[in-house]
């Protein structure tokens, strides 16, 4: 039983079904209609430390490239690369140092000049001729709605079941006779399962509390004024044929192409929360469109199509939380920032832990560098277990980077 049909939950459910298990996926709304729908969906390991967490994310990049051919990747996988610009003295120094650092770890990253940037992205309008420009050719973005549609289709084609709405909204979690995990839904059903995996994003702490394990999944509070978890997502269009084809980051804006001839826009300095008035959201959205017009070509006819506050799940120590919960060992959780980057790889690791007897090849198809032992704890996940928070007062150390 998998709770939550965002990109991580759908990936986990599809991997487990592919490993030969009978899987039910529960979703209170419709698959892919929550946080994943509004994600910037930037697949990267750019500025993610320490080294083991960088390596986990780098493996996530490779995992999507490996999975794409099996899931009609042309519909959702965009290995476009990322251009990042820095204009201040401190920004230029930081970007140059980061590129050198990442390259030393074997991550594709290099500094380029304005001429090469123009060749890579003809739509780019350089804000400053003295800008430092970095090129990250291995990075990508995903169209999450199309991706999740294909993950769910693959799940059901392998015998999986998807329950949505009241049938998929979890209202209780406990164990029955023989300590069998049970999930109660808003439709009144009580469903037994051998394993329950919670991939419910920011709702995971509340579900952990239902299972009697309150406080074991510390996320940054996302529903209070001033929280760093919410971000403003703006989509604009139509975009002309001369518009951008790659991810672009500047100090003022982050943007990428989106489906339907739109651009997806975000910015680090647009503080919003779930209490921000609609009039302020519209003002900020218009501001982001003007910034985008100063950054890329193709937006002469564009207008704001959507402005949405997206509340992201941010673990308190900014690292993934994956594994069985202290106090409710029958409940397995997987919650992380960078869920889009990590979903393909984390789901593979989780399937290896929860599918004993699964042939090794089924878990590592297309990934010969990944060493997994089905049914055994994953060494790659050892640092990310919920138990690390036991007896601590975990808290976030700074604003979310969005990376």
Q: Where do the model's predicted regions map?
A:
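N-terminal Rossmann-like FAD-binding beta1-loop-alpha1 element of flavoenzymes
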Residues: 1-24
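Short hydrophobic core segments
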Residues: 2-3, 190-203, 207, 347
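Active-site substrate-recognition segment that forms the wall
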Residues: 14-15, 43, 75-77, 202-327
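Glycine-rich FAD pyrophosphate-binding loop
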Residues: 17-37
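Dinucleotide-binding Rossmann-like beta1-alpha1 core, especially the glycine-rich loop
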Residues: 40-120, 252-254
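Helix-loop-beta segment of a Rossmann-like dinucleotide-binding subdomain
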Residues: 74-84, 111-157, 268-273, 329, ...
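Helical element adjacent to the flavin cofactor pocket in flavoenzyme catalytic cores
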Residues: 134-187, 191-194, 199
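C-terminal catalytic lobe of FAD-dependent flavoproteins
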Residues: 296-403
């Amino acid at each position: 039983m998998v709770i939550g049909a965002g990109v991580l939950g759908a990936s986990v459910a599809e991997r487990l079904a592919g490993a030969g298990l009978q899987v039910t996926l529960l979703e209170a709304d419709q698959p892919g209609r929550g946080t994943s729908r509004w994600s910037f969906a930037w697949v990267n390991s750019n500025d993610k430390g320490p080294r083991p967490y960088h390596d986990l994310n780098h493996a996530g990049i490779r995992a999507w490239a490996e999975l794409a051919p099996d899931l009609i990747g042309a519909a959702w996988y965009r290995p476009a690369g990322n251009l990042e610009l820095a204009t201040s003295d401190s920004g230029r120094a930081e970007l140059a140092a980061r590129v050198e650092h990442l390259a030393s770890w074997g991550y594709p990253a290099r500094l380029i000049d304005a001429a090469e940037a123009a060749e890579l992205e003809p739509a780019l309008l350089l804000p400053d001729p003295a800008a430092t420009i970095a090129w990250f050719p291995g990075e990508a973005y995903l169209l999450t709605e199309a991706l999740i549609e294909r993950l769910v289709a693959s799940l059901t084609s392998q015998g999986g079941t998807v329950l949505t709405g009241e049938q998929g909204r979890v209202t209780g979690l406990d164990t029955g006779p023989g300590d069998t995990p049970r999930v109660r839904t808003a439709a009144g059903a009580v469903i037994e399962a051998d394993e329950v995996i919670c991939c419910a994003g920011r709702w995971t702490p509340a579900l952990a509390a239902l299972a009697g394990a309150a406080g074991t999944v510390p996320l940054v509070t996302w529903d209070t004024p001033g929280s760093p978890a919410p971000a403003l997502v703006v989509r604009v269009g139509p975009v002309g044929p001369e518009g951008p084809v790659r991810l672009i980051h500047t100090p003022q804006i982050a943007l990428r192409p989106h489906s339907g001839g739109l651009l997806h826009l975000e910015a680090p300095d647009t503080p919003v929360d779930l209490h921000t008035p609609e009039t302020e959201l519209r003002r900020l959205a218009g501001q982001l469109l003007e910034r985008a017009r100063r950054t890329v070509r193709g937006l002469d006819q564009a207008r704001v199509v959507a402005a949405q506050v997206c509340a992201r799940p941010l673990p308190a120590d900014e690292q993934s939380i994956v594994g069985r919960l202290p106090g409710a060992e029958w409940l397995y959780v997987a919650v992380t920032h960078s869920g889009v980057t990590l979903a393909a790889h984390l789901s593979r690791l989780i399937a290896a832990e929860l599918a004993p007897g699964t042939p090794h090849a089924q878990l590592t198809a297309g990934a010969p560098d990944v060493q997994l032992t089905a049914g055994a704890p994953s060494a790659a996940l050892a640092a990310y277990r919920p138990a690390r928070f036991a007896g601590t007062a975990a808290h976030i150390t700074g604003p979310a980077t969005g990376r």
